[in-house]
Amino acid sequence: MDDFQTAIYFFDAAVTEDIYYGADPVDNPKPSTHFLMLEGEANYQSAKELTKFAQTKVERALEYYTKLTSNSEILELTLDDLRKEFIYYALMATDKPGLRTLVTAFITYFIEWDFRNDHFECEVKKGTSEPFFLHLFRGCILFESLMKLNPVISPKSKTIGGILQEPKIISKLKIKSIQGKKDGFVLEDIFDKSQRYDNSIDQAIQISYMARNTLGHSLGWDANINQSQYRELYLIIGASCLHVIACLWRKT
């Protein structure tokens, strides 16, 4: 079984020790820091192939995100930007150790999809959707956490719906105010919205918000998720995470 979360837990433990003894992911990198910094091109690392694998999956998500925002005023987010503005900042923020969890969650979210996607080859069409729902929900929690803990604008609200209605936040994200639903969303709402998805960052954020408030309240939906729906939601939620980093984690 590909237990990515446990594997990265030990990578992070190594990074903790290396930084304690003087390592710096940029100025004095070590094999452990190369992985969390997604530096698959770097030499002198025993996990080079795994690092390259992780980097490739994040680059795939960046490519998707770039297509969503190519016709907007949003500044492009490159892999180097991601390393500098998010990963390096989080690794070196010793007064905010919780940010490290965002980095490891970010990496595991993007690399886990390929493993989960292979499950569909077993053709269990009416069985459990737990692996897919929990994977997507982790991405939703990451999306929410990136907004709550961003270093540029501290949100006043404690809920994702409230945050996505704060004028300063939506202005920085360059999106419209997110609308909820009085009786709450159900899984079919997400699938319907995804079918009408216009490949805009506005709708990507809306769908991610809906997924957060649906998968976060129940796993026992009668509707199963299919392979194409899983792939689409994985990319949409990932793009939403990258958008928050692009707009709310740049310090300049």
For each predicted feature, which ranges?
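Short, hydrophobic, well-ordered secondary-structure elements
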Residues: 100-114, 126-158, 238
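Charge-enriched, short contiguous segments at helix-coil
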Residues: 191-252
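Extended amphipathic alpha-helical coiled-coil/heptad-repeat regions
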Residues: 1, 6-14, 26-29
